[in-house]
């Protein structure tokens, strides 16, 4: 089974397709091991044996138009039926066990803030739905039995879904059309499975030693009447909680960069818009002393407080122990990496994992401070999930 990725950088009218046909993608236990390496990487929130850092070494690469037509063949009976299932699944997410589980976790996480264990911590959740783009009847008829494949679950996951290449490409192109200002990627490796994302957050990008990262924290629903843009959006009021959250992330990233550079500039914070949400954003550009240490830089930056917490290591351990649903590759990062060429790595937000039966697991989270309110935080995760739900 090949590993492949479609990805489209913000504002571009073309996308890139990369694939590795020969051999297996490189499996790494830590992002530090990316030092001196090139390829296309997908990294989890916390590397482990089950969810390693995976580095593709593409032997095929080509540009494709990101403005293709929608695949109309899915608009049949099964599409209508799964649209009804989608509405049912989303309705279930706002009541019953999903909400109750989130409320329990919120109380657990929130208590740690009052006890002074963390100054900020991020709580995430997951929603599972049946996708109208990959209906079960289509997926099941495309299954290929391969007795030579190992029985390991991670290596066989998504093999049937990936057979439906036309639907997957159409799903990617639709996401590109809906979100021209976001980084859009559809990535499959035997180790990670199949992921689709439309994310606004740069982890690290640049060429040679000129690098850029960002602090993206603070969220509220956007007004439809406002101009959709990445440049500063005027007239948006922010609560003290959101401004404090943004400053935590900015301070953390600035401290990380000082280890690798003594030449950096900040711009912000300012209001930006991503899909249906406003965010507070600060851009940080810096000159990297040693381009062979991209893995070290990534290890210092990620996961940022925007998706983890402060202090980072303690917050990540707490999240791994107390979130009921493992994040897997949500809130990790993805994109092409090069020591001498161009690097474009984005945080894996507004994403979903497409499973072997055609169902999808959507992820979203929000940063908690002492003054956070459970109902507001729940609604924030609902709004963030809407980015990918709108594609479906």
Residue ranges and their predicted role:
Residues 3-20, 132-137, 145, 162-244, ...:
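An anion-binding catalytic pocket shared by soluble metabolic enzymes
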Residues 11, 21-142, 149-162, 166-167, ...:
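Non-catalytic accessory segments adjacent to catalytic cores
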Residues 13-16, 48-50, 129-131, 194, ...:
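Flexible loop/turn segments at secondary-structure boundaries
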Residues 40-42, 120-122, 186, 212, ...:
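A structural signal for short, well-ordered beta-strand segments and their strand-loop junctions
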Residues 62-100, 105-106, 126-142, 214-321:
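Contiguous alpha-helical scaffold segments within structured protein domains
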Residues 119-124, 185-189, 295, 312, ...:
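Short coil/turn segments at secondary-structure boundaries
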Residues 292-392:
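Conserved hydrophobic core element of enzyme catalytic domains
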């Amino acid at each position: 089974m090949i590993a492949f990725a479609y990805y489209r950088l913000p504002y571009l009218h073309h996308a890139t397709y990369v694939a590795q046909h020969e051999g297996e993608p490189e499996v790494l236990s830590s992002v530090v091991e990316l030092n001196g390496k090139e390829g296309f990487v997908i990294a989890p929130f916390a590397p482990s044996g089950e969810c390693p850092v995976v580095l593709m070494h593409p032997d095929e690469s080509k540009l494709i138009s990101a403005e293709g037509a929608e695949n109309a063949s899915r608009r049949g009976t099964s599409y209508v039926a799964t649209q009804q299932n989608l509405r049912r699944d989303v309705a279930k997410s706002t009541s019953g066990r999903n909400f109750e589980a989130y409320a329990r976790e919120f109380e657990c996480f929130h208590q740690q803030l009052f006890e002074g264990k963390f100054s900020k911590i991020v709580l995430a959740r997951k929603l599972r739905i049946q996708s109208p783009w990959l209906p079960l009847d289509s997926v099941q008829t495309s299954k290929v039995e391969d007795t030579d494949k190992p029985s390991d679950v991670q290596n066989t996951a998504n093999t049937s879904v990936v057979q439906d290449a036309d639907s997957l490409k159409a799903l990617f192109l639709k996401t590109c059309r809906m979100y021209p200002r976001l980084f859009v990627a559809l990535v499959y490796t035997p180790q990670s499975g199949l992921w689709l994302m439309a994310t606004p957050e740069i982890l690290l990008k640049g060429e040679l030693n000129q690098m850029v990262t960002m602090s993206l924290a603070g969220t509220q629903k956007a007004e439809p009447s406002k101009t959709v843009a990445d440049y500063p959006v005027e007239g948006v009021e922010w609560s003290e909680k959101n401004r404090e959250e943004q400053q935590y992330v900015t301070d953390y990233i600035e401290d990380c960069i000082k280890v690798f550079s003594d030449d950096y500039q900040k711009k912000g914070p300012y209001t930006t818009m991503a899909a249906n949400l406003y965010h507070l954003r600060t851009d940080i550009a810096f000159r990297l002393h040693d381009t062979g240490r991209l893995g070290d830089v990534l290890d210092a930056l990620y996961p940022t407080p925007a998706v983890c917490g402060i202090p980072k290591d303690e917050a990540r351990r707490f999240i791994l122990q107390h979130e009921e649903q493992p994040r897997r590759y949500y809130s990790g990062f993805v994109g092409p990496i090069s020591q001498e060429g161009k690097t474009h790595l984005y945080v894996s937000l507004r994403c979903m994992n497409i499973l072997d039966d055609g169902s999808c697991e959507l992820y979203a989270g929000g940063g908690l401070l002492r003054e956070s309110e459970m109902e507001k935080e729940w609604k924030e995760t609902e709004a963030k999930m809407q980015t990918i739900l709108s594609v479906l």
